[in-house]
Design a protein with these regions (language model features):
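Amphipathic alpha-helical dimerization/coiled-coil segments
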Residues: 2-7, 26, 87-130
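N-terminal helix-turn-helix DNA-binding core of bacterial DNA-binding proteins
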Residues: 7-50, 69-72, 76-80
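Short, hydrophobic-biased segments on the C-terminal half of alpha helices
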Residues: 55-56
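Glycine-centered, phosphate/nucleic-acid-interacting loop/turn motifs that mediate DNA/RNA or nucleotide
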Residues: 62
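Short beta-strand "wing" residues that participate in macromolecule-binding interfaces
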Residues: 66
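Basic, amphipathic "hinge/linker" alpha-helix immediately C-terminal to the N-terminal HTH DNA-binding motif
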Residues: 71-92, 96
C-alpha cells in the first residue's frame, strides 16, 4: 500500500472523482480483456455521447486505451485500462479510502459525544447544563 499522505485530499484526482468516470474506471478495473463501448455504456448507464466525452477525457490522461477493430464487418470499440491508469486509479482509491475512514471516525466521535449529552428521552442537554 502506498504511503499515507499528509493531506489525503490532495490525492483525490478530479479525473476519477467525477461519478461517471469513477463508475467507468471501476468497471474497467474488473475487465482484464477490456469492455466494448456498448458493454461499458450499459454497465455505467450512460448515453453514447456522455460515454464518448468521458472516454476522451480518460484517453487524453492516458488512463485508458481504446482499440477499434472490425468483427463480422462491423466496427467494434473496446476500452482497456492502461497500466498507468490502473496504477493511478489504485492510488486514487487508497486516498479516497483514507479520507472516508477519517470522516467515519470523526462522525462516530461526534455521535458518541452527542449521545453522551442526550437525556434518556432523546433531548439534547444544552452546553453547561449537563
Amino acid at each position: 500500500m502506498a504511503a499515507k499522505h499528509e493531506n489525503p485530499y490532495a490525492a483525490l484526482k478530479t479525473l476519477f472523482h467525477e461519478p461517471n468516470r469513477l463508475a467507468m474506471m471501476s468497471a474497467l478495473s474488473q475487465a482484464i480483456d477490456g469492455l466494448t463501448f456498448n458493454d461499458l455504456k450499459r454497465e455505467c448507464g450512460l448515453t453514447d455521447g456522455n460515454l464518448s466525452r468521458h472516454l476522451k477525457t480518460l484517453e487524453e490522461a492516458e488512463a485508458i486505451r481504446i482499440e477499434k477493430t472490425f468483427v463480422d464487418a462491423k466496427p467494434r470499440t473496446t476500452v482497456f485500462l492502461s497500466d498507468a491508469g490502473r496504477k493511478s486509479f489504485i492510488e486514487y482509491l487508497q486516498a479516497l479510502e483514507e479520507v472516508l475512514q477519517k470522516a467515519a471516525r470523526s462522525v462516530a466521535a461526534v455521535e458518541k459525544k452527542s449521545a453522551s449529552r442526550r437525556l434518556p428521552w432523546g433531548k439534547l442537554v444544552k452546553a453547561g447544563e449537563g
